[in-house]
Every structure is written in structure tokens, then in C-alpha cells.
């Protein structure tokens, strides 16, 4: 408790508050700048994609919100659904980074720290939130997702000095790992009573019928 009181006294000082806000803005500027560079296929060494934990958590939470909105027809829009979406986004980031590192290293690349680059490339999906407010952008959203995938693949090829086939092997490994881990997490949510299996089945049937 004394530590929290001390921290509270420190952050009440205007100079410290201003310095902290400037640091946050600087980190966000670096992250957004890296997003812009990656979007234009301008890559750097993976070791240079370093960000503060606060920025990384904020980006993952935003991606979780976008993911929750896209999955709301299946899982609903409750707190449990949002929590599940955020967890799945974090798991996706970890599994994809780890899978690509293992596959690229297997094919001769050094053990690359891909956490930062994967996060930057995944953050390019944040504009998809606009589709919820402007449904007419749905076609553009598909093109945007395709380009983000190309951006990520090209970056991994460049960083790992690998062919597109080897990178796709990494995506296969990621898909298998994500399917296993995601299924376990979903079952835990259902077992805990946070999600209802019958409701999920009804939503899935409604989605299937709507697409037919």
C-alpha cells in the first residue's frame, strides 16, 4: 500500500504527468510510424521493433475489440465475448510469432524476435472497425485484409531470408496451434458458464442459413 501511495504522490506532480504523457505520445508515434512503413513494404531488422509493454497491451486490447465486433454474430456482445476475443487475439499474436520463429529457424534463419513485427503488422487490421459503422466498406475491407496478409508474408520472407513456401509452412503450423489452443479456451469459457453452448449452436445455425 505504501508503494501505491508513493506512486500516487509522484504522479500528482504536473511535471511528472507531462513527462509521462510525452513518453506515451513518443512511443505511440514510433509505433504508428512503423505501421506506416510496414504498410509500404519498408522493413527493418526484427530486433528494432521494440515497444513499451503499455503500448503493446493497448494495441492488443484494441485488436481484441475489433475481433469482438467481427465475432459478435456468433459469440454475442457480452463481457464474456469481449474477454474471449481479447484473449484469442493475444494467443494469436503469441502463437504466430512463435510458429514463424521456429519454422524460419528450422530453415536456417537465426532465432528472430518477431513479437514486435507481428504486432505492428496485425495492428494494420485496426481500420476494419470502420466497417461496423460504414457497411458499404465491406468489399474494401476484404482487399485491406488481403494486403495486410501480403505485407506480413513479405516481411517474414525478408527477415528470415525465406521463400514464400517456407513462410506458408509457418502459417500452417500457426493454424494448427491456434485451432488447438483456441478450442481449449472456448471449452473453458463454456465449462465456466460464461458462454452458453446452446446459444452458440443457434447463432452458428443462423449464420449458416444466412449464407446459403
Please state what every model-predicted region is.
Residues 130-139:
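Membrane-interface helix caps and helix-loop-helix hairpins in membrane proteins
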Residues 59-64, 125-129, 178-183:
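Hydrophobic alpha-helical transmembrane segments in multi-pass membrane proteins
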Residues 23-115:
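Selected alpha-helical membrane-embedding segments in polytopic membrane proteins
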Residues 139-212:
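Terminal transmembrane helical module of multi-pass membrane proteins
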Residues 43, 74, 78, 103-108, ...:
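Membrane-interfacial segments
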Residues 1-26:
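N-terminal amphipathic/basic-hydrophobic helices that include classical n-h-c signal peptides
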Residues 60, 115-123, 143-148:
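Short hydrophobic alpha-helical membrane-embedded segments
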Residues 87-92, 96, 111-131, 172-177:
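Transmembrane alpha-helical segments of multi-pass membrane proteins
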Amino acid at each position: 500500500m505504501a508503494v501505491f501511495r508513493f506512486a500516487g504522490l509522484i504522479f500528482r506532480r504536473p511535471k511528472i504527468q507531462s513527462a509521462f504523457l510525452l513518453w506515451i505520445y513518443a512511443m505511440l508515434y514510433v509505433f504508428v510510424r512503423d505501421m506506416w512503413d510496414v504498410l509500404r513494404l519498408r522493413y527493418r531488422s526484427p530486433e528494432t521493433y521494440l515497444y513499451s509493454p503499455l503500448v503493446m497491451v493497448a494495441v492488443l486490447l484494441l485488436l481484441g475489440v475489433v475481433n469482438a465486433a467481427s465475432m459478435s454474430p456468433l459469440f454475442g456482445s457480452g463481457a464474456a465475448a469481449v474477454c474471449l476475443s481479447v484473449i484469442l487475439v493475444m494467443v494469436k499474436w503469441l502463437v504466430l510469432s512463435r510458429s514463424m520463429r521456429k519454422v524460419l529457424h528450422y530453415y536456417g534463419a537465426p532465432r528472430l524476435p518477431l513479437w514486435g513485427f507481428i504486432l505492428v503488422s496485425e495492428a494494420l487490421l485496426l481500420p476494419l472497425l470502420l466497417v461496423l459503422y460504414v457497411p458499404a466498406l465491406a468489399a474494401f475491407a476484404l482487399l485491406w485484409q488481403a494486403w495486410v496478409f501480403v505485407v506480413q508474408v513479405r516481411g517474414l520472407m525478408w527477415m528470415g531470408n525465406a521463400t514464400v513456401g517456407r513462410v506458408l509452412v509457418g502459417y500452417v503450423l500457426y493454424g494448427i496451434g491456434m485451432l488447438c489452443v483456441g478450442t481449449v479456451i472456448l471449452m473453458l469459457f463454456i465449462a465456466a458458464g460464461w458462454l452458453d453452448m446452446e446459444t452458440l449452436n443457434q447463432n452458428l445455425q443462423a449464420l449458416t442459413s444466412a449464407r446459403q
